[in-house]
Amino acid sequence: MIIIALDFGTKNIGVAVGQNYTNTARSLPSIKVKNKKLNIEKLNKLIDEWKPNAIVVGHPLNIDGTKQKITQCSENFSKKLKNIFKIPILLHDERLSTVEAKAILFEKYGYKSLKKERIDSMSAVIILESWFLYSKN
């Protein structure tokens, strides 16, 4: 089963693709958000290319599990995706994914690798691989 993961943001959306056979994911180029509008063409292209069985969207919660301002935006984004693509859209806890993404990128590639787009897509990888582990249980 092919799954696309999206790390929702108001300026960039991190993207990763993976499959549940190996429970691994790889990052893809992030999608820019302009004037709070999603680039549907780029997302359509991704869906056409990868033909995912589902999309996992990062669900941003506070450390204590409560919702924050961007949580509702992510939930609304997920609803839009469900209406557009007619495939399962699954929210998955993304707490600390950005912190982990920065640590991985810094360790592998150094300080210069810490660009926002790269961090967002690495966060999407972390979200998807976490979802694979969660969905096994």
Curated annotation (Swiss-Prot):
Gene for this chain: yqgF
Name the record gives this protein: Putative pre-16S rRNA nuclease
Primary role: Could be a nuclease involved in processing of the 5'-end of pre-16S rRNA.
PANTHER family linked to this entry: POLYNUCLEOTIDYL TRANSFERASE, RIBONUCLEASE H-LIKE SUPERFAMILY PROTEIN
UniProt keyword Magnesium, yes or no: no
EC number: 3.1.-.-
EC primary class: hydrolase
InterPro entries: RNaseH-like_sf (IPR012337), YqgF (IPR005227), YqgF/RNaseH-like_dom (IPR006641), YqgF/RNaseH-like_dom_sf (IPR037027)
Compartment list: Cytoplasm
Gene Ontology process terms (BP): rRNA 5'-end processing
Gene3D superfamilies: YqgF/RNase H-like domain (3.30.420.140)
Presence of keyword Hydrolase: yes
GO molecular function terms attached to this record: nuclease activity
